[in-house]
């Protein structure tokens, strides 16, 4: 994968999970390594040394001098923002010298291409979006497994792609299907990545400090598509639909949409409601010839007017994951699996089986007919909007933390519609309070999450939910979102004990 270069000199910037994976991958291919990190002693340095990887380590600020000594390739960790001045100067210097800058995803794409010369041709499915990535990735992996495929799930979800690929090679167990969760950070440096099918679930404000603007963030998401990649797009999201090819465009890639309304284009997916029951459905042209995989049909672009029927797949209530947003995630996963011609029957069985991921609209207890819901992974406004609208019941919301410069205005409508009260915590509680004041919903400030949970429990009525969906990052008060969830769960356990219930 390194062409004709013998033992090329590679500079790896950043020693997080992906940086360590890049270093391991390069070392196994005989590369000489220089690893740089702004930290003098990054946590993964000990792991690198324990594995016996021979590498020069340089701690401290990045400078173009790191390229000295014959660097032929730069591996860039996804957590490093290209807008950071020192990194931007280093990357510019690399470009001037003709030194390629790859992220882990590009290393992975190049590795698959090299393996392809030996006959390895797996299917690759990829998922991105502001929210729902992990759920949809895990669900897609399960669907493919239940269809009899050997599957590897990797990327932003962990493990790192290169680590998973190395393990598969060592075990002589290369998968039939790769299912990759990809963040905007990982996609920023994508160059030749071209999966068989890829989905963008949604695009709302997030990571603007890293990308610099919403447009730059959205464009990074769009790098998930290659020229021939089947595009699976959320038609309810205008920012996502900008990646739909123009109608009638020559050589346009195959496109499938999903949404929470009835689909009207042959091969699209959505929800149909009949007698109070919501169904997951596929739009089918009654006049189209039968084919083994409906999503691989090319839409007719002639004068033919399709006679669309709504083919029922399963009731939405049969899903074990709650909320309309999760119905959309299920449709996206189903569309991806069908895009690589997997049969529908085992996919539908798997949809009924999947129980969801921790900290993602997860009901952790029901006490006195009040649901306690952990959505600590809801670290941006879009995630909290989805949780509120998806639960569709009266809610006492707990929100707040580090808002990362977001606009909280999208919370106004769902809070006004669904919330009985809002408990505010963390650094940006005042900003959220100012935004939500117009809703007329009672707002209360709390110094601790524990206090907010107990106050929420006192306000909740039977049939309500107490929802931790902060719309913010956690680092102003907690180690990470999982620590925040642990504190929430401990408080719920206390409430259960106080009420003589079993959480």
Swiss-Prot record:
The keyword Cell cycle applies. Coiled coil: none annotated. The keyword Cell cycle applies. ATP binds at residues 129-135. It comes from the Bacteria. One of its GO terms (biological process) is peptidoglycan biosynthetic process. One of its GO terms (cellular component) is cytoplasm. Residues 289-308 are annotated as: Disordered. Gene3D superfamilies: Mur ligase, C-terminal domain, Mur-like, catalytic domain, NAD(P)-binding Rossmann-like Domain. Keywords: ATP-binding, Cell cycle, Cell division, Cell shape, Cell wall biogenesis/degradation, Cytoplasm, Ligase, Nucleotide-binding, Peptidoglycan synthesis. It catalyses: UDP-N-acetyl-alpha-D-muramoyl-L-alanine + D-glutamate + ATP = UDP-N-acetyl-alpha-D-muramoyl-L-alanyl-D-glutamate + ADP + phosphate + H(+). Pathway: Cell wall biogenesis; peptidoglycan biosynthesis. GO terms for molecular function: ATP binding; UDP-N-acetylmuramoylalanine-D-glutamate ligase activity. It is found in: Cytoplasm. Its EC number is 6.3.2.9. SUPFAM superfamilies: MurCD N-terminal domain, MurD-like peptide ligases, catalytic domain, MurD-like peptide ligases, peptide-binding domain. Belongs to the MurCDEF family. Cell wall formation. Catalyzes the addition of glutamate to the nucleotide precursor UDP-N-acetylmuramoyl-L-alanine (UMA). This is UDP-N-acetylmuramoylalanine--D-glutamate ligase. It comes from Burkholderia lata (strain ATCC 17760 / DSM 23089 / LMG 22485 / NCIMB 9086 / R18194 / 383). The gene is murD.
């Amino acid at each position: 994968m390194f062409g004709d270069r013998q033992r090329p000199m590679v500079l790896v910037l950043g020693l997080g999970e992906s940086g360590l994976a890049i270093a391991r991958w390069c070392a196994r291919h005989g590369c000489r390594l220089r690893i740089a990190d702004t930290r003098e002693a990054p946590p993964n340095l000990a792991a690198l040394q324990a594995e016996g990887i021979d590498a020069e380590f340089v701690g401290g600020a990045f400078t173009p001098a790191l390229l000295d000594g014959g660097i032929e390739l730069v591996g860039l960790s996804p957590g490093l923002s290209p807008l950071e001045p020192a990194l931007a100067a280093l990357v510019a210097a690399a470009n001037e010298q003709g030194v390629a800058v790859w992220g882990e995803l590009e290393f992975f794409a190049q590795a698959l291409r090299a393996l392809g010369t030996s006959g390895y041709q797996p299917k690759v499915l990829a998922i991105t979006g502001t929210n729902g990535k992990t759920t949809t990735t895990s669900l897609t992996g399960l669907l493919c497994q239940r269809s009899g495929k050997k599957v590897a799930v990797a990327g932003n979800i962990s493990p790192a792609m290169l680590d998973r690929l190395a393990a598969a090679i060592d075990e002589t167990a290369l998968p039939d299907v790769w299912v990759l969760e990809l963040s905007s950070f990982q996609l920023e440096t994508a160059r030749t990545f071209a999966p068989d099918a890829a989905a963008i679930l949604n695009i709302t404000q997030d990571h603007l400090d890293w990308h610099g603007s919403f447009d730059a963030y959205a464009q990074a998401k769009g790098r998930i598509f290659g020229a021939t990649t089947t595009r699976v797009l959320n038609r309810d999201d205008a920012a996502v639909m900008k990646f739909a090819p123009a109608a009638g465009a020559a050589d346009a890639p195959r496109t499938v949409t999903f949404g929470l309304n009835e689909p009207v284009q042959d091969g699209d997916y959505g929800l149909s409601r009949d007698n109070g029951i919501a169904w997951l459905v596929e739009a089918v042209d009654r006049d189209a010839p039968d084919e083994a995989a409906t999503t691989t049909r090319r839409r007719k672009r002639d004068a033919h007017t399709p006679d669309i029927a709504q083919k029922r797949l399963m009731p939405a209530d049969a899903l074990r994951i709650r909320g309309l947003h999760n119905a959309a995630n299920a449709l996206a996963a189903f569309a991806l699996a069908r895009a690589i011609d997997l049969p529908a029957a085992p996919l539908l069985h798997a949809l009924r089986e999947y129980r969801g991921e921790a900290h993602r609209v997860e009901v952790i207890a029901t006490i006195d007919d009040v649901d306690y819901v952990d959505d600590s992974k809801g670290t941006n406004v879009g995630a909290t909007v989805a949780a509120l609208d998806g639960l569709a019941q009266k809610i006492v919301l707990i929100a707040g933390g580090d808002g990362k410069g977001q606009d909280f205005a999208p919370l106004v409508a769902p809070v006004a519609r669904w919330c009985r009260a809002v408990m505010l915590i963390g650094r940006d509680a005042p900003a959220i309070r100012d935004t939500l004041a117009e809703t007329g919903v009672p707002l209360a400030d709390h110094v601790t999450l524990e206090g907010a949970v107990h106050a929420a429990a006192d306000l909740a009525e039977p049939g309500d939910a107490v929802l931790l969906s902060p719309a913010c990052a956690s680092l102003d008060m907690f180690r990470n979102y999982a620590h925040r969830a642990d504190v929430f769960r401990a408080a719920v356990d206390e409430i259960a004990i106080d009420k003589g219930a079993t959480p």
